[in-house]
């Protein structure tokens, strides 16, 4: 941790002796800079270009050194637009990696990749800053306690429970509900959770970042009257930013979370939306740096880049980081190198299915594809484990019978299979749930369902006690009592129609 009382801005430390170079070449967001012999900057050092463009506008671009080319030249990637830069412009080597403000001063504020506030609420205290590049905690510092993290979402808590201090991935293609699910988790966990949260918006829509900020202000997670009382820091590098910014914004958010864990010894929640964009930005930068592409056009350093980010997201004896990451799945192909590399680092995976989304079942979590290392009898208890396995078995049997049903119809099934299908359809609908953050779209109030209630509900469906109820009674309800009440209402309505 570096404390620098004299900083010229969040991203850069002031140096007594400036090491100056000049721009030799500009290719989009990539700059080649020539330095005097023996004065070469280190890899990952921050370089700053200051000056004026041809119209007289002030320019202030920060870059990060990526390659040493030889002949006293380095290749750097810009963290903001390179418009107005020209060959021959002066470049200052700051002598250190990008550093961002950390600690209580970051709470309630929105930052860019350089740690500069972008919310028009004035400057941030930059006395305590930390470099965004650092090594992961040593083995001896890691903590291995196992406990469940309750989310209030039935399908998650029952079938793929999250680990406190673990890494969780939300996998899905375009438009199946990853961002809504991550917003709901922020709503359910960040409000109930006593510690602080850090949200990293990596290469996603600016509108969603704005909606999230407004929502947090409304819910009190960000306290407008007293910013210091806020519970969350937001870091955004959106879709319209250069690849350098999108590639590093995840590290900026992580650095802020690490400070709360290591120095303040707090339990931190880290939300990243979307980790695929981190890989995508790395792929763009890799091509710009002239590296040979690997499988499916991704960068050859894909595993290394992902590992260096993911290994820092961990729980130590000082505090924990529980991270929830949305992972875009290109063309719904889970074997694509980007999601496949991410899988290896996670404790729980929540896979969103387009088929369920098409049926209108939200959250569209696939009960058979989603997995968790926590679903073991010694961790969750025998009853929870048993119910979860029976729910999966029933769903799997229904999946196997779907072809027969499509060709021959339900009447050709045996009595036992017909009962299985009826229960599986009730389970499928009962796994849906109204969300708090979707209230504005659906008009139905959100529901938080405790784990004990969830287990009781599925126990009743599997035991056959609710076989007489219509399946639509289980759709978009909270606990099982709401389903029975809805069934009675449906019965009354149908009698009135007659």
Swiss-Prot record:
Keywords: ATP synthesis, ATP-binding, CF(1), Chloroplast, Hydrogen ion transport, Ion transport, Membrane, Nucleotide-binding, Plastid, Thylakoid, Translocase, Transport. GO terms for biological process: proton motive force-driven mitochondrial ATP synthesis. InterPro entries: AAA+_ATPase, ATP-synt_VA_C, ATP_synth_F1_bsu, ATPase_a/bsu_AS, ATPase_alpha/beta_chains, ATPase_F1/V1/A1_a/bsu_N, ATPase_F1/V1/A1_a/bsu_N_sf, ATPase_F1/V1/A1_a/bsu_nucl-bd. It is found in: Plastid, Chloroplast thylakoid membrane. GO terms for molecular function: ATP binding; ATP hydrolysis activity; proton-transporting ATP synthase activity, rotational mechanism. It is an enzyme of class 7 (translocase). It catalyses: ATP + H2O + 4 H(+)(in) = ADP + phosphate + 5 H(+)(out). GO terms for cellular component: chloroplast thylakoid membrane; mitochondrion; proton-transporting ATP synthase complex. Its EC number is 7.1.2.2. It is a peripheral membrane protein. CDD domains: ATP-synt_F1_beta_C (cd18110), ATP-synt_F1_beta_N (cd18115), F1-ATPase_beta_CD (cd01133). ATP binds at residues 172-179. Produces ATP from ADP in the presence of a proton gradient across the membrane. The catalytic sites are hosted primarily by the beta subunits. F-type ATPases have 2 components, CF(1) - the catalytic core - and CF(0) - the membrane proton channel. CF(1) has five subunits: alpha(3), beta(3), gamma(1), delta(1), epsilon(1). CF(0) has four main subunits: a(1), b(1), b'(1) and c(9-12). Belongs to the ATPase alpha/beta chains family. This is ATP synthase subunit beta, chloroplastic. It comes from Calycanthus floridus var. glaucus.
